[in-house]
Amino acid sequence: MEKGINEISSVVKPNSIVVNKSTVPLGTAKKIQKALRRKDTHVVSNPEFLSEGNAIRDFLEPSRIVIGANSKEHSERVAELYSKVDAPILISSWESAELIKHTANAFLAMKLTFINEIATLCEITGANIKDVTNGIGYDPRIGIHYMQAGPGWGGSCFPKDSASLTQVARSFGFDFTLLEHTIELNQKHLDRTANKVKKMIPKDIEDKRVSAWGLTFKAGTDDLRYSPAVEVLKRLETEHFLITAFDPTVKGKLPELPLTEIANDPYACAEGSDLLAILTEWDDFKQLDMETVALSMRNPNLLDTRNVFEKHEMERIGFTYIGMGT
């Protein structure tokens, strides 16, 4: 960062504004302003809120615009750039703008963790997570977004920003116990998902074969960073399962999963396996002939961690089916 700041300082014209769009730790804008060593150049924090798979829509139709500055003049100059954008503009300090982005991602991670915990409770009590999330989602105080149970959460933002926020809190002498437990519970949920695979395959099978559909952390992206799908398969690799995986965006071996074979199509992936785990919610999977898939498997067990299919329909065509919270 220091090299970049020096380059900026050497080329910007007087009375320029340096706008930071990245997600950065609390206090970064103040550090950049000091490192620039120029009183005629000013830093503004303007974090982006683009989600992978929806970046164009989020850019053209933002839910809000956050502008953090240390003076009204500079925040208003940046706000003028968005004068034709139909979205609320929130003016704040540097610190608030930086904290807003981290807080948003950490809150969504916490929301997913809560729903995954409720999904586990549903499995124990006989309730159905789909009914529960529908029932609470109509409450406008809660909403319907980020309410889908799954194998765990990951991606390029949630793990990083949640960890960063706990570190910032710790640096100020505050133990952010709620968020620390959120991160810990997500790891336990990933363990729980891997354990479901182990329980579904008969113990007397020596060469336990698992097929996995989906490797990216969510549909609509090729991003594998901290993917819950990859994290679950890592756990199975350590248990010596024979794993074959398919993802429409992945071609060839993955260094993250050295023991996992990558199939060219979903049917070949499932053939001869003892369990099929759906780990990413690609829409393409809904179009496949699942009866053909079931017939091709050695043991037609289906672990649907994204609740892509309906249990009664999968059982009708011959699967032993387990979803998340169903």
PLM feature spans:
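Structural/interface elements that position substrates and couple domains in central-metabolism enzymes
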Residues: 1-326
